[in-house]
Each structure stands twice: as C-alpha cells, then as structure tokens.
C-alpha cells in the first residue's frame, strides 16, 4: 500500500513539473510573439520611394542591429492596400491618397520631381506640356513633328495603380487618356532601361533615378532641378508618403521618426530629393 501512495505522489510531482515547464515555454512564446513587431517590420509600395526607403533602412539597421526592416515594391496602390490588409506595416506612396484612403495615417517624407527622359542620342532637349500630352495621347507620333529626326515615337508608361503614372496623369494628361499603344512597365528602373536601349523611346521617371544612360528633358523650357522644384518654376513634382493603418507604434514609429530626423532627411537630400516640411519642422 505504501509503495502505491509513494508512486501516486511521485506522479503528481512529475505532472506538476511538466505543467510548470509547459507554462514557462508558453509564456516565453507569447513574449517572443509580442516582441516580434518591435524588432521587425515590412514596408511595401511605390517603386519610386523604394530605393530611398532601402537607403534609410540600411542606415537605421546599421545603427540598430536588432531591427529587421524588409522593403518591398509593388506600386503605390499595392502598398496602400497591403497596409489596409496588414500584410505590410508601412505603405509607400508617390501619389496623393484617394478619398477612401484618407482615413489612413500618413506623413510626407520628401518631395520629388517627375521627369521626361529620352535616349542620349535623341537631339530633342525641351518639350512643352502640350507636346508631352499629345505624345502620350498618340496625337503626335513621330519625332519629326517635334523637330527631331523622322522616327516613330516609342511611348513608355507605368502601369495602372502606379503613383508615378497617377502623378503624370494628373499633372500632364488631365482629361486625356494615355494611349493603349504605350509600352507599360512596372518600375522606374524598367522604364529607364527601355529608354536607354531605344533611341526613339520616351518615358517618365523619378528625378532622383535619372542616370547617365538617359537624358532628362526640360519641361516648358525649365530644367528639372531641386531648386526649380522648390521655387515652383518646375511644376512636375509630387509627395513621397509613408502610410500606416492607425498611428504608428514600436519599430514603425521609430523608423518613421528616423526618416523625418535631420539625419534621415540628409540621406534623402543627398539622393536628390527635396526635404519634407514635416522633417523641417522637427
């Protein structure tokens, strides 16, 4: 009988020990899960904003080795949607928010110019706003109509949902539609590469992404420079936004605060962007 009682006591102790271990492990897992949002974040959206966000993230992670920031593209609309569905913590947008998106928290991180680019072999240096609209509406179809050599104009445009396309449509096209004959690309880099490879192509990209293998055109005889964007003489400019579903917290807030800090703004200025008014106020 005594042996049976001892065995029962031993079993109860074992069960108690196992329960304590399980509880400890469970608490540890809960703690780890609750800490995950603090140490990792996903940022998705505009391919115009993406390269600058990558520069900011690289610097932030160098200063804060425990942080993990994953930057993804997809376009402005995709980034905003990802924020709404919580598949991304922060959305990147290079267009203004639509009415049904304005409930989202957002902040301007910088301003950017939009430029028309052609191949360096193209002799054209300047186009008017009307000429650009007519090119993209396919009313003007040959470079000879603009003083260039007789060659068909190959029109390169961004995809629907792109903030770059949205800004171009609003600022240049107005009520006109971009021709369905345009070659559609899903990133600034892809547009730039096609123009670099084709002497008869024209495209539009972010000012900060212009490289030596393409030529930026003057618009209405005004050069696309940071100074001309700031003084308003060059009118093709837009906001770069970070968007979150509600007031940002944890790592999201820390990264956004870093972006708007003097150090973050300096990084963006060095890359050719115009500092944010939000950042200037800090």
Residue ranges and their predicted role:
Residues 28-32:
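C-terminal motif of bacterial Sec signal peptides marking the signal peptidase cleavage site
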Residues 2-21:
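Bacterial N-terminal signal peptides that target proteins for export
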Residues 33-87, 91-282:
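Exported/periplasmic ABC-transporter solute-binding proteins
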């Amino acid at each position: 009988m005594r042996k049976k009682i001892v065995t029962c006591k031993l079993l109860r102790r074992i069960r108690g020990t196992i329960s304590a271990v399980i509880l400890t492990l469970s608490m540890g897992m809960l703690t780890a899960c609750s800490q995950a949002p603090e140490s990792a974040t996903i940022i998705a959206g505009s391919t115009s904003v993406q390269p600058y966000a990558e520069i900011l993230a690289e610097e932030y992670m160098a200063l804060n080795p425990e942080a993990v920031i994953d930057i993804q593209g997809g376009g402005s609309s995709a980034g905003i949607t990802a924020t709404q569905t919580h598949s991304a913590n922060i959305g990147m947008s290079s267009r203004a928010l639509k009415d049904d998106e304005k409930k989202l928290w957002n902040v301007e991180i910088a301003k950017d110019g939009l430029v028309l680019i052609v191949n360096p072999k193209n002799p054209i240096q300047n186009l008017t706003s009307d000429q650009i609209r007519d090119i993209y509406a396919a009313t003007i179809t040959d470079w000879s109509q603009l003083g260039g050599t007789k060659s068909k104009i190959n029109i390169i445009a961004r995809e629907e949902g792109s903030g770059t396309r949205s800004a171009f449509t609003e600022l240049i096209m107005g009520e006109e539609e971009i021709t369905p004959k345009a070659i559609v690309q899903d990133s600034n880099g892809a547009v730039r590469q096609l123009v670099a490879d084709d002497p008869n192509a024209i495209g539009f990209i972010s000012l900060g992404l212009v490289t030596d293998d393409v030529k930026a055109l003057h618009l209405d005889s005004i050069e696309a420079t940071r100074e001309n964007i700031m003084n308003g003489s060059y009118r093709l400019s837009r906001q770069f936004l970070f968007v979150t579903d509600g007031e940002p917290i944890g790592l999201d807030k820390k990264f956004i605060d870093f972006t708007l800090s003097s150090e973050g703004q300096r990084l963006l200025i060095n890359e050719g962007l115009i500092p944010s008014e939000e950042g200037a106020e800090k």
